[in-house]
């Protein structure tokens, strides 16, 4: 299962992407964040396969 990180500053588009990923059952959502600083921290501790921005 591919590990995904979502980076989006607007709440609604971020939540929509989360829902689509989770409903597909094909991806593991590692984190969904609203900024680059938090995204970099996630990338340092997780092996991310795909980043959606």
Label each residue range with its predicted role.
Residues 8:
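Conserved acidic carboxylate
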Residues 32-41:
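Helix N-cap/capping motif at the beta->alpha junctions
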Residues 11-31:
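Two-component/phosphorelay signaling modules centered on CheY-like receiver
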Residues 46-52:
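Active-site beta3 strand of CheY-like receiver
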Residues 36, 52-53:
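Conserved phosphotransfer microenvironments
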Residues 1-3:
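Non-catalytic signal-transmission and effector/linker regions of two-component phosphorelay proteins
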């Amino acid at each position: 299962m591919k590990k995904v990180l979502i980076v989006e500053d607007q709440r609604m588009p971020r939540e929509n992407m989360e829902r689509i990923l989770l409903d597909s059952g094909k991806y593991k959502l590692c984190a969904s964040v609203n900024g680059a600083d938090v995204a970099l921290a996630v990338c340092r501790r997780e092996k991310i396969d795909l980043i959606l921005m």
